[in-house]
């Protein structure tokens, strides 16, 4: 099915019921922030992310910075949602810098060990373009340079001007606009840190501004995501200006990845809403296929009775205790559930049957 057909099917879901609006909003809040930050190395679990962002609580171990970064990420999401409501306001560099300031919150110093011994340091400035060259060592072993500090401001000015003009012309689709903006932005890499997170927020700014769904680039597809960018880099070359002014026809690999991602995200929402009368279970954007009906029955029981004992589970499901313990351990490893500090079971998988939605 073509992307336009899936988009039309997605649009046909509206207007959504209040229950579905809440369900999909909470789903996106957890899944977007969890995945976008995990791509950059955040260590919070899916359950910790949900508990923090939906319930305002902290549980389990974790680096304080990871908790703070996750909360800041959601503030960035809300900032994007607020900005797209004013369709008459063009994109500005100031908006991007303010978004970066929200994500990083404050300046901080990075210390790095030198190969021959000793240490060097530099300051990352929240909301300010980079003041030192930045580059990345690719997984293929070569060093990839981004725009220099001296050319960054002018390239960002050109990027924003291009976007506003391209939006008015309307030749590119919203997905093409979002993909090309992401690619050009990453080739500039205007900030010392946080560029990937900003790029993904800007994709959703562009998508939502044009009436398309905000999307999640999944951490499980990180290798595919980076490979799509890399293949486009190979086609364009290493010179930063080549990437900063790339044409849509030069980023076919990355555009294909983005189109596929958008299709999958829209289809996921379609399937969830259209299965509102069925007991289908989802986790991190994927439908769960159970080996037997006992899996779904177990999750439903734990959701309804979070303090249920193993003996009660066994009696209720007519399954022996050891089999239940084994299944629960499997579900925990997959992230479908966890156990809270008070001993209660918390289901992280989502049931699309709206009457079972219990946030």
Regions found by a protein language model. Name each.
Residues 1-193, 197-359:
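FIC/Doc superfamily catalytic core
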């Amino acid at each position: 099915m073509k992307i336009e057909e899936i988009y039309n099917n997605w649009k046909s879901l509206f207007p959504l019921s209040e229950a579905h609006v809440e369900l999909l909003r909470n789903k996106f809040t957890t899944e977007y922030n969890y995945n976008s930050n995990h791509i950059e190395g955040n260590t919070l679990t899916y359950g910790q992310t949900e508990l923090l962002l939906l319930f305002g609580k902290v549980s389990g171990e974790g680096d304080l910075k990871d908790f703070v970064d996750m909360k800041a990420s959601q503030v960035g999401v809300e900032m994007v949602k607020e900005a797209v409501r004013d369709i008459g306001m063009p994109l500005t560099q100031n908006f991007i810098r303010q978004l970066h300031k929200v994500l990083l919150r404050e300046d901080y110093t990075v210390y790095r060990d030198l190969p021959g011994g000793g240490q060097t340091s530099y300051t990352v400035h929240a909301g300010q373009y980079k003041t030192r060259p930045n580059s990345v060592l690719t997984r293929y072993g070569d060093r990839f340079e981004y725009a220099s500090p001296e050319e960054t401001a002018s390239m960002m000015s050109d990027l924003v001007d291009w976007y506003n003009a391209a939006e008015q012309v309307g030749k590119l689709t919203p997905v093409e606009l979002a993909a090309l903006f992401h690619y050009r932005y990453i080739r500039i890499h205007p900030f010392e840190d946080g560029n990937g997170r900003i790029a993904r927020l800007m994709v959703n700014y562009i998508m939502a501004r044009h009436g398309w769904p905000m999307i999640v680039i999944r951490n499980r597809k990180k290798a595919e995501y980076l490979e799509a960018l890399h293949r486009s880099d190979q086609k364009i070359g290493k010179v930063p200006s080549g990437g900063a002014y790339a044409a849509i026809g030069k980023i076919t690999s990355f555009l294909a990845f983005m189109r596929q991602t958008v299709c999958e995200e829209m289809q996921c929402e379609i399937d969830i809403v259209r299965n509102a009368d069925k007991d289908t279970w989802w986790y991190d954007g994927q439908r769960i296929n159970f080996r037997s009906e006992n899996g779904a029955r177990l999750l439903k029981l734990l959701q309804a009775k979070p303090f249920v004992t193993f003996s009660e589970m066994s009696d209720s499901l007519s399954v022996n205790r050891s089999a239940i313990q084994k299944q629960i351990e499997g579900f925990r490893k997959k992230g479908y559930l966890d156990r809270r500090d008070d001993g209660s079971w918390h289901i992280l998988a989502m049931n699309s049957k709206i009457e079972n939605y219990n946030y």
